[in-house]
């Protein structure tokens, strides 16, 4: 009993430390940018003690960006955890089902074929105004991502929801979306191609309060549902047959989990672009710290995802001269070495 209590205290302490780290990273994120701010100036703007440029920068630009990092980081990380548990595959991530590829195709179709979100008044890049209808590309990106999810899950129902079938179907359909995107870009004008490529970059700078609210609703609903199903995920860790003997409807659990994870990913990607590796780095780091118990790993994954995306966004704005680098590039640079380490560690473990 004492050992269990000490483990509970340890896990609680880890969650508290993660929460404190998120708060500190958020405050640091507010201070970094092309217009650097001191701690006192940032606090004055947050507390409404001053107006002017500082307040407009904080509340009009940096707060929406900060909220997007918090929400999307949590959503992508929890999505990765759900996919890894549901599929029994440590390499699974929000891109496993081709969600990101479908969203990119939808956005490219909107921008290249219909000038969605852009006012096309000629062939000069200066004539493309991304502020005309910023939701056009996002809407089509989400619709194609959702359609891809439903298509894969529908096909997999025919094969009793085998995890291997899900992964292979996701890879195959992702390749189809990538090929279709390539064809679209091949026939695009120079300006349309540039706009489409820029959209695909993971960029928190396009976040607004409206998009943050939509992402918040989707991610909160998905995370709460996942937390309510945590004991079923713990049972699934023992294997599908063992989970069935405990009264868990394994095919239904996998269906709900993959649908939830994919929809959270689709919402985030449709507004912010592709942000990779968050769903791989954070869940695995959390499992090493806290173990496999989903009562702890779900909230810890959400916090660690928010922390990673905050730090990546801060780094992207620190490295960019006058403008922020795409945050998706930063997470990929951090995630690729981690992914290779994971691959080699699994190989070593299997050879023992």
Positions of predicted regions on the chain:
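Alpha-helical transmembrane segments in inner-membrane proteins
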Residues: 1-352
């Amino acid at each position: 009993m004492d050992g269990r209590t000490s483990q509970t205290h340890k896990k609680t302490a880890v969650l508290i430390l993660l929460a404190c780290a998120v708060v500190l990273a958020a405050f640091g994120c507010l201070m970094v940018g092309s217009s650097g701010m001191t701690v006192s100036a940032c606090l004055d703007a947050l507390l409404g003690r001053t107006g002017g440029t500082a307040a407009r920068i904080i509340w009009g630009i940096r707060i929406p960006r900060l909220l997007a990092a918090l929400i999307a980081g949590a959503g992508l990380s929890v999505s990765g955890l759900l996919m890894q548990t549901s599929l029994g595959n440590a390499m699974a991530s929000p891109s496993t089902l081709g969600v990101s590829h479908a969203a990119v195709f939808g956005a490219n179709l909107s921008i290249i074929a219909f000038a969605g979100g852009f006012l096309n008044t000629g062939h000069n890049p200066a004539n493309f105004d991304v502020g005309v209808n910023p939701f056009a590309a996002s809407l089509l990106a989400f619709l194609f991502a959702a359609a891809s999810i439903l298509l894969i899950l529908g096909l997999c129902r025919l094969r009793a929801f085998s995890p291997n079938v899900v992964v292979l179907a996701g890879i195959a359909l992702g390749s189809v979306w990538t090929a279709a995107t390539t064809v679209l870009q091949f026939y695009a004008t120079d300006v349309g191609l540039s706009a489409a490529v820029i959209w695909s970059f993971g960029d928190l700078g396009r976040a607004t309060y409206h998009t943050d609210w939509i992402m918040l609703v989707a991610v909160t609903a998905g995370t709460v549902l996942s937390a309510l199903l945590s004991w079923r995920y713990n049972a699934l860790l023992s294997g599908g047959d063992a989970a069935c003997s405990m009264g868990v409807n394994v095919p239904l659990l996998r269906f709900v989990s993959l649908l939830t994870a994919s929809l959270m990913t689709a919402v985030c990607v449709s507004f912010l672009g592709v942000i990779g590796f968050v769903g791989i780095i954070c869940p695995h780091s959390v499992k090493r710290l806290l173990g496999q118990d989903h009562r702890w790993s779900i909230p810890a994954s959400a916090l660690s995802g928010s922390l990673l995306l905050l730090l990546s966004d801060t780094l992207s704005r620190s490295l960019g001269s006058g403008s922020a680098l795409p945050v998706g590039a930063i997470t990929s640079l951090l995630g690729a070495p981690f992914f290779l380490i994971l691959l080699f560690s699994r190989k070593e473990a299997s050879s023992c």
